[in-house]
From Swiss-Prot:
<dbReference type="InterPro" id="IPR036645">
    <property type="entry name" value="Elafin-like_sf"/>
</dbReference>
<keyword id="KW-0677">Repeat</keyword>
<feature type="signal peptide">
    <location>
        <begin position="1"/>
        <end position="19"/>
    </location>
</feature>
<dbReference type="InterPro" id="IPR050514">
    <property type="entry name" value="WAP_four-disulfide_core"/>
</dbReference>
<feature type="disulfide bond">
    <location>
        <begin position="95"/>
        <end position="118"/>
    </location>
</feature>
<keyword id="KW-0646">Protease inhibitor</keyword>
<dbReference type="InterPro" id="IPR008197">
    <property type="entry name" value="WAP_dom"/>
</dbReference>
<protein>
    <recommendedName>
        <fullName>Whey acidic protein</fullName>
    </recommendedName>
</protein>
<comment type="function">
    <text>Could be a protease inhibitor. May play an important role in mammary gland development and tissue remodeling.</text>
</comment>
<keyword id="KW-0494">Milk protein</keyword>
<feature type="domain" description="WAP 1">
    <location>
        <begin position="23"/>
        <end position="73"/>
    </location>
</feature>
<feature type="disulfide bond">
    <location>
        <begin position="53"/>
        <end position="69"/>
    </location>
</feature>
<feature type="disulfide bond">
    <location>
        <begin position="107"/>
        <end position="122"/>
    </location>
</feature>
<feature type="disulfide bond">
    <location>
        <begin position="47"/>
        <end position="59"/>
    </location>
</feature>
<keyword id="KW-0732">Signal</keyword>
<dbReference type="GO" id="GO:0045087">
    <property type="term" value="P:innate immune response"/>
</dbReference>
<dbReference type="GO" id="GO:0004867">
    <property type="term" value="F:serine-type endopeptidase inhibitor activity"/>
</dbReference>
Amino acid sequence: MRFLTSLALALIALEAALALAPALNLPGLATCPELSSSSEDPCVISCVNDESCPQGTKCCARSPCSRSCTVPLLVPVPKAGRCPWVPAPLAPELCLEKNECSRDDQCRGNKKCCFSSCAMRCLDPDTEAPLQ
């Protein structure tokens, strides 16, 4: 009997600790995956909104008649500015450099992932309006 009481108290303490834990801060926008096209999905509503889901999940439509807590897809937030202008080479050149990035979210601070002569680099963005 003591074991069950201790186990119950431990579970209550764990639940309280998880409820007080700070939200997971991930860069980007959390979006729900696409709806399932399967006609076999049962019509079950297991959540009402994101607040009714465990931390790190969202309340998403899984089919036209069901909602459940789901791990969201993260879409990177676009960074401000645009990549600096790089003149094109007059003749093809061999590039021995390796790419440093492939997306803006792989660059620190406000830097953007931009083409720089022959490879992708994290560069400071141009914030001026483009010439017309």
